[in-house]
Amino acid sequence: SIAELCKVLTTGPLNADTEVVVGCPAPYLTLARSQLPDSVGVAAQNCYKVAKGAFTGEISPAMLKDLNIGWVILGHSERRAIFGESDELIADKVAHALAEGLKVIACIGETLQEREAGQTEAVCFRQTKAIADKVKDWSNVVVAYEPVWAIGTGKTATPEQAQEVHVALRKWFTDNVSADVSASIRIQYGGSVTAANCRELAAKPD
């Protein structure tokens, strides 16, 4: 349960050098925030691209801030695939969330078909470029590489596969944004990460 997870994260101990952020469904954001220490961030799993208006069912960054939520996950593969969110819409959402003072976990990643077709880098670069076209300050952005074929399938990208993509992304940032952003931006891997494989994945330099 959320209460049990919050208790574990509260009693820890957590590594002081590691920023911990918990992403939970919207109905439980307030509960999670109230039960976690301030040192643990809470992220919404989505938000919309404008502050207010006739968008029934959508949650704005302003609403999240009212709940004392500091983070939001945007561009998750399920939002792209199931709800048809385009690269452009996700970029607009990222830009607006940042402008409103939220920190963003921006998700990118390829499908199995795209990987088998040798399109992994092309897809990741396209998705990242859409965001880069709208975002100039990357200090509050974490890029999450989440290969679609490794989400909820039990399949995990090998540490070597994840590292290859992360290296390619850093080079893309060097070539298309700046060397400073490339060196400082956090890139994380997501996709069937478990207690059994997290140490090996985390050992990779990128």
From Swiss-Prot:
One BP term from GO: glycolytic process
Pathway: Carbohydrate biosynthesis; gluconeogenesis; Carbohydrate degradation; glycolysis; D-glyceraldehyde 3-phosphate from glycerone phosphate: step 1/1
Active site (record annotation): 76 (electrophile), 146 (proton acceptor)
Alphabetically ordered keywords of this record: Gluconeogenesis, Glycolysis, Isomerase
Catalytic activity: D-glyceraldehyde 3-phosphate = dihydroxyacetone phosphate
Cited PROSITE patterns: TIM_1 (PS00171), TIM_2 (PS51440)
UniProt cross-references to InterPro entries, sorted A to Z: Aldolase_TIM, TIM_sf, TrioseP_Isoase_bac/euk, Triosephosphate_isomerase, Triosephosphate_isomerase_AS
E.C. numbers: 5.3.1.1
GO terms assigned for molecular function: triose-phosphate isomerase activity
Cellular compartments per GO CC: cytosol
Pfam families, A to Z: TIM
UniProt keyword Isomerase, yes or no: yes
SUPFAM superfamilies: Triosephosphate isomerase (TIM)
Family in the record: Belongs to the triosephosphate isomerase family.
PANTHER family registered for this protein in UniProt: TRIOSEPHOSPHATE ISOMERASE
Quaternary data: Homodimer.
UniProt name for this protein: Triosephosphate isomerase
Organism of provenance: Aedes togoi (Mosquito)
Gene (UniProt): Tpi
